[in-house]
C-alpha cells in the first residue's frame, strides 16, 4: 500500500489563548488556566505553531506516514483541541446518585469524595479527586468541573467505580453513582 507523503492536521487557536511548543511539549494558556502535556511518546510527529493571514493555528504533521502514524496525527490534534477547549470554557461531568432503599449521602472532604450508607454499609467508600478538579454535590447530583478533560473524566470514573457492586445482580441492585452527562461549560 502506498504511503502518504505529508499527513497533517490543523487546530485553530482562538483569541485570548497562547500556545507554546517546545519540542514535543505543548503548553496552552487561556482565561481559565494553563495546561501542559508531553507528546514525546508520539514518535515521528512534529508539532508547531503557524500563523496564516493573522490567524494562529497548531500544525501537527508527519512525513511518509503509515496507518498508525496517520492515526497518531489526528489523536495528537484532538488532544490539543481538548486542551484549548479546557482553558477557554472548561469541562463538566454530571453524575446521578441512585438508590432504592438505603439513602446514599455523598460528601467532599479535601481531595476525596466519601460515600456514606451505600447499600447500608457502615464504613464509607472513598473516591480520589484529582488535582485541578472541583466536585460539588447538589441534592442527588454530583457535578465535576475542571480544565483538563482527562482529570475530570478520571475523577468521575473513580466515583463511579467506588460504588460498583459485586456479587449482586446489577439489574436488581441499581444503587450507585452514574455519569449521565458530559459537556463543555459555557
UniProtKB/Swiss-Prot annotation:
Task: List the SUPFAM superfamilies.
Answer: Ribosomal protein L6
| Entry keyword set | Ribonucleoprotein, Ribosomal protein, RNA-binding, rRNA-binding
Record Pfam families:
Ribosomal_L6
The record ties this protein, via Gene3D superfamilies, to: Ribosomal protein L6, alpha-beta domain
Q: Name one GO biological process term.
A: cytoplasmic translation
InterPro entries in UniProt: Ribosomal_uL6-like (IPR000702), Ribosomal_uL6-like_a/b-dom_sf (IPR036789), Ribosomal_uL6_a/b-dom (IPR020040), Ribosomal_uL6_arc (IPR019907), Ribosomal_uL6_CS2 (IPR002359)
**The organism's place on the tree of life at top rank:** Archaea
Q: What cellular component terms from Gene Ontology apply here?
A: cytosolic large ribosomal subunit
Q: Name one GO molecular function term.
A: structural constituent of ribosome
Entry annotated with the keyword Nuclease:
no
NCBIfam families in alphabetical order: PRK05518.1, uL6_arch
Q: Which family does it belong to?
A: Belongs to the universal ribosomal protein uL6 family.
Functional description taken from the UniProt entry: This protein binds to the 23S rRNA, and is important in its secondary structure. It is located near the subunit interface in the base of the L7/L12 stalk, and near the tRNA binding site of the peptidyltransferase center.
What is the protein's quaternary organization? Part of the 50S ribosomal subunit.
Protein name according to UniProt: Large ribosomal subunit protein uL6
Q: Gene of origin?
A: rpl6
Amino acid at each position: 500500500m502506498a504511503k502518504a507523503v505529508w499527513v497533517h492536521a490543523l487546530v485553530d487557536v482562538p483569541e485570548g489563548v497562547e500556545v507554546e511548543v517546545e519540542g514535543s511539549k505543548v503548553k496552552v494558556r487561556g482565561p481559565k488556566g494553563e495546561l501542559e502535556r508531553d507528546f514525546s511518546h508520539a514518535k515521528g510527529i512534529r508539532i508547531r505553531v503557524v500563523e496564516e493571514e493573522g490567524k494562529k493555528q497548531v500544525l501537527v504533521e508527519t512525513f511518509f506516514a503509515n496507518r498508525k502514524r496517520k492515526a497518531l496525527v489526528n489523536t495528537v490534534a484532538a488532544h490539543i483541541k481538548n486542551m484549548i477547549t479546557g482553558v477557554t470554557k472548561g469541562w463538566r461531568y454530571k453524575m446521578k446518585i441512585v438508590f432504592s432503599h438505603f439513602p446514599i449521602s455523598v460528601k467532599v472532604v479535601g481531595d476525596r469524595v466519601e460515600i456514606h450508607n451505600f447499600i447500608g454499609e457502615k464504613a464509607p467508600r472513598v473516591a480520589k479527586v484529582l488535582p485541578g478538579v472541583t466536585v460539588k454535590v447538589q441534592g442527588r447530583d454530583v457535578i465535576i468541573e475542571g480544565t483538563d478533560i482527562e482529570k475530570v473524566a478520571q475523577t468521575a470514573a473513580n466515583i463511579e467505580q467506588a460504588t460498583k457492586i459485586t456479587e449482586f445482580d446489577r439489574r436488581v441492585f441499581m444503587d450507585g453513582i452514574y455519569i449521565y452527562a458530559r459537556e463543555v461549560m459555557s
